[in-house]
């Protein structure tokens, strides 16, 4: 459906503009240390993870997938890990604490174990 595809494209573009604004706000607040190309790349990479995470779970863990709260939380962890590489020294302890709270082992071929 061409109309649905166009509406989704507009939605995706709005989301990425808003996400870029959030990341730019983190830069201005001194939470993340990034230049504009890095903000753009992080925005795009975060969008890719957020929109592909459920599909990843289904293809990695089989047709039933693992859509538990833990595995959805792990998707948030993946994005936070990308962001953490740009964290300022002042923000790093809070980000690391949040990473520890969100981390869930995958128990999949990605981490070398079998399900």
For each predicted feature, which ranges?
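C-terminal peripheral helix-coil segments that are non-catalytic and often amphipathic
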Residues: 55-115
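Residue-level recognition of alpha-helical structural elements
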Residues: 4, 35-39, 64-68, 72
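Amphipathic alpha-helical packing segments from all-alpha helical-bundle domains
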Residues: 3-29, 40-55, 73-81
């Amino acid at each position: 459906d061409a109309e649905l595809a166009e509406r989704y494209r507009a939605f995706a573009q709005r989301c990425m503009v808003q996400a870029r604004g959030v990341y730019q706000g983190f830069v201005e607040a001194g939470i993340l240390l990034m230049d504009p190309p890095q903000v753009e790349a992080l925005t795009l990479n975060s969008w890719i993870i957020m929109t592909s995470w459920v599909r990843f779970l289904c293809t990695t863990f089989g047709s039933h997938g693992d859509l538990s709260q833990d595995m959805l939380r792990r998707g948030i962890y993946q994005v936070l890990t990308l962001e953490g590489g740009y964290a300022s020294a002042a923000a790093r302890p809070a980000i690391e604490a949040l990473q520890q709270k969100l981390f869930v082992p995958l128990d999949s071929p990605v981490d070398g174990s079998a399900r």
